[in-house]
């Protein structure tokens, strides 16, 4: 069901304001188990029902590594310093990150590279 941005959980609203301050919400939808948000720039964010983000993807511009915990960001920069982030998905104890070099890399919350594959 389509909702007003003010209908998003406070944690989701705060995350968008902090991480994408100049990118207004174009569309917000509430589903049974999550929320889907589209920003004006084309960035799409999926939130858990509690407002914590679970997936961010950007078809037109790279995502900032600052969206990741420091340990994960540092491991990614060390492995692929020139690659741009297109999608980030939170897993239970790791992150799945899609890069512009057609790689998907899996990094644990503490920065250990768990694996990668060519997409």
Go through the PLM ranges and name each one:
Residues 1-119:
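Long, terminal "pre-/pro-" and other extracytoplasmic accessory regions
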């Amino acid at each position: 069901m389509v909702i007003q941005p003010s209908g998003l959980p406070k944690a989701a609203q705060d995350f968008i304001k902090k991480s994408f301050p100049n990118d207004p919400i174009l569309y917000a939808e509430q589903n049974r188990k999550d929320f889907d948000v589209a920003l004006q720039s084309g960035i799409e964010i999926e939130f858990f029902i509690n407002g914590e983000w679970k997936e961010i993807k950007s078809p037109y511009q790279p995502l900032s590594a600052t969206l990741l915990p420091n340990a994960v960001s540092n491991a990614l920069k060390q492995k692929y310093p020139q690659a741009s982030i297109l999608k980030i998905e939170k897993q239970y104890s790791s992150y799945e990150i899609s890069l512009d070099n057609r790689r998907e890399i899996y990094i644990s919350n503490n920065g250990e590279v768990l694996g990668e594959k060519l997409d």
